[in-house]
Regions:
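N-terminal regions that are enriched for targeting/export leaders
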Residues: 24-45
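Papain-like cysteine protease catalytic cores
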Residues: 83-189
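C-terminal motif of bacterial Sec signal peptides marking the signal peptidase cleavage site
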Residues: 17-18
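Solvent-exposed loop/turn segments at secondary-structure junctions
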Residues: 66-67, 92-94, 127, 136, ...
Length: 382
């Protein structure tokens, strides 16, 4: 994700490099602040333990994997997936591309939530306990080591067999030895691909956005730097997008959120509640579009939305971050609905969450515009 300025949260100084940050920090949850803003009666979607991405740029993978995990927990199926395995497969793939491009490509772990679906469909998945992310690893340094290794292979015209062998030695030393080729779960044996398909099929999730420079209720490749695979997002009017988010969360489904965290409210949240400045209201489709076109809304970070609550007349969404439990309220932060309206780049959710009301025909992935309806016409009925 894109590099941002130093962000102050309470007394903590967090330095972002994309969606990562330096490890040295203190979390405001240590003082207990913020819990007054999370009503006791609120139902939070069950999740796996909060993880810490360190200074890596893998927030997109953390956020999307967390969403997949929570979706399964909702259905009574506990699953905890390995980030390190995805990072290793991604780096190996990029190394091959870099070699054949003779160094005219870059090696980076930046990405978007839909990319995670592509990677687990292609390479499979591993349980978290089988290939746990080592806490000491610096993925930015590892990317530079991979590039240096590839440059050497290019200069020697070594071929990909030798390059793969050297890469595996590097990854084994830096990340850890790969687990067995088979995944063992509940007495059954799977290949990594079979295991991945048991937790997520490619068509199981839909990605949504809302920008007026493309037709509504059609798919388009979102113009953000990290959309490296040119994934297509379903474009909805802003009110419809927000309705999908709210109804999904209220029905117990997690939502993967991608958006901008450069707002002043995010830099200094009051008791972990992040709002936008008053002069930004009301947030309309036009004001949101202006922020995006003037490059003030950028694709900075990915989190998982796991709950919602009202504070006075303002709705907030509870987001699970990937900066460890010592950040925010035990790893959680609350974004106002206005913040989401203005600063959301895109969201991803299961198709089941997207089709929250099966009595109504909604826009389904890759349907034609004539099959779609205006959700605002049923807004007061749900």
């Amino acid at each position: 994700m894109e590099r941002k300025n130093i962000i102050t949260i309470g007394l903590a100084l967090l330095v972002f490099a994309g969606c990562g940050y330096k490890q040295q920090r203190t979390g405001i949850s240590e003082t207990g602040r913020g819990e007054d803003y999370l009503p006791e009666h609120i139902h939070l979607i069950s999740t796996t333990p909060v993880k810490d991405q360190g200074n890596s740029e893998l927030c997109w993978a953390y956020g999307m994997l967390a969403t997949i995990e929570s979706e399964h927990i909702m259905k009574g199926d506990s699953v905890n997936l390995s980030i390190a395995y995805i990072a290793r497969m991604m780096l190996e793939e990029q190394a091959m591309e870099y070699y054949f491009a003779q160094g005219k490509k870059n090696i980076s772990l930046r990405g978007t939530a839909p990319m995670l679906i592509h990677y687990i469909d292609k390479y499979g998945a591993q349980p978290y306990d089988s290939y746990e992310d080592p806490k000491h690893i610096n993925y930015k340094v590892l990317c530079r080591k991979v590039q240096k290794l590839c440059d050497g292979a290019i200069s020697k015209k070594a071929g990909i067999s030798q390059l793969k062998e050297e890469l595996n030695d590097l990854f084994d030393a830096e990340i850890g030895y790969m687990p067995a080729k088979s995944v063992h779960m509940l007495g059954a044996e799977y290949t990594p691909q079979e295991f991945a398909h048991s937790v997520c099929y490619p068509e199981e999730y839909v990605s949504l956005t809302s920008f007026s420079h493309h037709p509504y209720r059609e798919y388009f490749a979102l113009e953000i730097p990290d959309n490296r695979m040119h994934d297509a997002y379903l474009n909805l009017p802003l009110d419809e997008l927000m309705l999908h988010i709210r109804k999904a969360v209220e029905k117990g489904h997690p939502v993967c959120w991608e958006g901008d965290i450069s707002e002043p409210g995010f830099k200094a949240p009051q008791k972990n509640c992040v709002d936008i400045q008053p002069m930004e209201r009301p947030v309309t489709q036009a004001s949101r579009q202006k922020e995006f076109e003037q490059l003030r809304t950028t694709d900075d970070h990915v989190m998982e939305i796991i709950g919602t609550f009202m504070k006075g007349k303002q709705r907030f969404y509870v987001c699970r971050n990937s900066w460890g439990k010592n950040w925010g309220n035990k790893g959680l932060i609350y974004l106002s609905e206005d913040y989401l309206r203005l600063k959301t780049i895109a969201v991803s959710m299961s198709e089941e969450a997207y089709l929250y009301d099966r009595s109504v025909r909604l826009v389904v992935p890759y349907s034609s515009p004539k099959d779609s309806i205006n959700l605002l016409s049923i807004y007061n009925k749900v």
